[in-house]
């Protein structure tokens, strides 16, 4: 409780100074590590513990944190030992300050750069690292991570609005874990700060400042996106077992000739059929069923493999064989099955490649949002200042 009160006091002070809100985002969330190094690339920082001030951390200096056998953070600055801690806060002096961070684990992890403040905590699984970052700075990082740096500004406007809305809708997704969002794709990919590679990213976020999507009643609209829907969007119950009335499957001709519109993957017949038998009691002695499995056709999106009565969700097959989408057909090729698929991702909501094509055809961000999010409208809505 003392840690939380101290953190809230610090964050309130910095939020009042800037007029913006900090999001608490777990970074490097898909990696486990027991040590990390940081370098202050731009600007100066202060290091605090829940007990108070520890040291200045100036531009060009480096920190190293190592989890010791007692699960304490062993902290050094430029090689000088500063103490053992359970929790540390690294606080920037100005909004533009940023660090380079490199976790050190069994698997090589590339360093990333981040703006904002940082909370470092020791636990039984290793080091947990949270980035306390202003919403609009976070969005710039999301756009860079989710869409790359080569899109047109009009597309970045679209992505900024739906990503801002998604963050608002999911700000309590990891509340029980002590943070708002993580940097994995199920929250939104966030692999570091926007570092000026594309002016259009900054302009796309700035030009849509505070804009979110709402429904006709003014309630926040659920926003989802994937790389390519394969020419037909999916319904939510086909993927997540949750039915949302605004998400009705419909054709999308904008993406059908783009880079990720089609894919192919071979799977051994024996492996595929044994998977069906083991997980869904599929009768391998039924020649007709086996034939249907090897020659499955999906001209329009379906929810189940072969027939709903068999209870084989396409999403389960996708997960088991790491397929690009659930939108595929099968044909036998020797001792293998050739899966010919369409799209990349779940196919719900915005089709990123379709939206990029719409921009190329001269459509505005508002027209694109209306096409992909039926029944939505734009509204200015801020996050609550004190979420917890």
Residue ranges and their predicted role:
Residues 4-14:
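Sec-dependent N-terminal signal peptides
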Residues 18-388:
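Conserved, single-site charged/polar hotspot
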Residues 2-3, 20:
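N-terminal secretion targeting segments of exported proteins
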